Design a protein with these regions (language model features):
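A short glycine-rich, Lys/Arg-flanked "PGG" loop and its adjoining helix->strand segment in the class I
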Residues: 235-247
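Core SAM-dependent methyltransferase catalytic element
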Residues: 219, 260-281
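Residue-level signal for inorganic ion chemistry
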Residues: 86, 220, 245
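Conserved AdoMet
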Residues: 2-104
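Conserved beta-strand signature within the Rossmann-like core of class I S-adenosyl-L-methionine
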Residues: 248-255
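Extended basic-aromatic, gly/pro-enriched interface segments that bind polyanionic ligands
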Residues: 132-217, 221, 225, 233, ...
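A short His-aromatic
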Residues: 228
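Conserved SAM/SAH cofactor-binding pocket of Class I
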Residues: 93-164
Length: 281
C-alpha cells in the first residue's frame, strides 16, 4: 500500500494521538509524508509502511515513531522578553528568600531553552552580586533531541544570531571547528558550568501524572508545545502543570497559548506571563 494514501495518514494520526496526545490537523499531509520518510530511515525498515505502523501499534519501534513525528522548532532566547522578566523581576524576588530556586522547562527540545534559562540565571547573579542557587529540570518526549541537548553542541553560524546584545556567548560556550561538506564549520559547545545546572529527562506531557511533588517548582516554562494538542487536552495538561507550581510561582506560555480554565487562578503580569495566586479547585 502506498504511504501517501489517506488510510496511512489516518492511522498515523491515530497512533500519534494515542502515544503522545498530539493532534495533527487536516492540512499536515506534506509534513506527514516527510516524517514517514524519516520514520523509515530511523527504523531501517524496508517493508510496507502499513505493516510498520501495525508493528508500532503492537509496541515495536515506538521510540522511533515518536522521535520522527514530534516537532522541535526552537532557538536560544526565543521570545526573549520572558528571559528579561526572569532576570529582572522573578530572580531578584526569589533571591531574597535565600532558598534554592526550582525551574521546570517542560518542552526542552534540543536544549536551547533550558540553556537560555541557565544563562539568564548567571546574568542575574552578576547583576545582583548574588549567588542564587538554581536547579533546572528539562523534559521532552523525544529521546533524540534530549541527547542533542545533553551534548550541548550547536552551529555557531545559526546560534550567534539568536543571542540578545547583552549576552556574550564566549562566557558560556567553547568554540571548536569541524569539517563539513561546505568546508570548515564553527561549532559552540555549552560549558560544564551550565550543564551542571540542568537535569534532562524524558517525559510525556500527556501522561496521567508527572513524577514531581505538588508545588515543587517556583517557575515553569511551557512554551510553544500546547499548540500541538487539542483544546481539551491543553486544558488537562495545564491543570497538571499548575499542580506542581508554587503559589506565587511564575508560568510562562508561548505567544499563541492561553490558560483557559485557569485564568481565574492567576495574575497576568506580562505577555503570557502568569503568577499563580491560588490552587485550582
Amino acid at each position: 500500500m502506498s504511504y501517501t494514501t489517506q488510510d496511512v495518514h489516518n492511522k498515523i494520526k491515530k497512533l500519534l494521538y494515542s502515544l503522545t496526545g498530539i493532534t495533527l490537523t487536516e492540512n499536515k499531509d506534506i509534513m506527514i509524508k516527510n516524517r514517514i520518510e524519516k520514520l523509515i530511515r530511523n527504523c531501517n525498515y524496508r517493508g510496507d509502511i502499513m505493516d510498520l505502523l501495525n508493528l508500532i501499534e503492537q509496541g515495536k519501534y515506538v521510540t522511533e515513531f515518536i522521535n520522527s513525528f514530534t516537532t522541535n522548532k526552537t532557538h536560544f532566547f526565543r521570545e526573549d522578553f520572558h528571559f528579561l522578566d526572569l532576570k529582572d523581576r522573578v530572580l531578584p524576588q526569589l533571591s531574597k528568600s535565600g532558598q534554592k530556586v526550582s525551574i521546570w522547562c517542560s518542552a526542552s527540545s534540543t536544549g536551547e531553552e533550558p540553556y537560555s534559562i541557565a544563562i539568564t540565571v548567571k546574568e542575574a547573579n552578576e547583576e545582583l552580586n548574588s549567588n542564587i542557587q538554581v536547579s533546572i529540570m528539562a523534559t521532552d518526549i523525544d529521546t533524540s533531541v534530549l541527547q542533542y541537548a545533553k551534548d550541548g553542541i550547536y552551529r555557531y553560524s545559526k546560534s550567534s544570531k539568536e543571542f540578545p546584545s547583552y549576552i556574550k556567548p564566549q562566557k558560556y560556550f567553547k568554540r571548536r571547528t569541524q569539517e563539513s561538506f561546505s568546508g570548515e564549520e564553527v561549532l559552540i559547545k555549552v560549558k560544564d558550568e551550565l550543564k551542571k545546572m540542568i537535569t534532562f529527562n524524558i517525559l510525556n506531557l500527556n501522561d496521567e501524572t508527572y513524577p514531581f511533588r505538588d508545588k515543587q517548582f517556583d517557575i515553569i516554562f511551557c512554551r510553544n508545545v500546547l499548540i500541538y494538542f487539542s483544546t481539551k487536552d491543553q486544558n488537562i495538561i495545564l491543570k497538571k502543570l499548575f499542580k506542581h507550581l508554587q503559589i506565587g510561582g511564575t508560568l510562562y506560555l508561548g505567544h499563541s497559548e492561553s490558560l483557559q480554565d485557569l485564568i481565574h487562578y492567576v495574575k497576568r503580569v506580562g505577555q503570557n506571563i502568569f503568577i499563580k495566586e491560588k490552587d485550582f479547585i
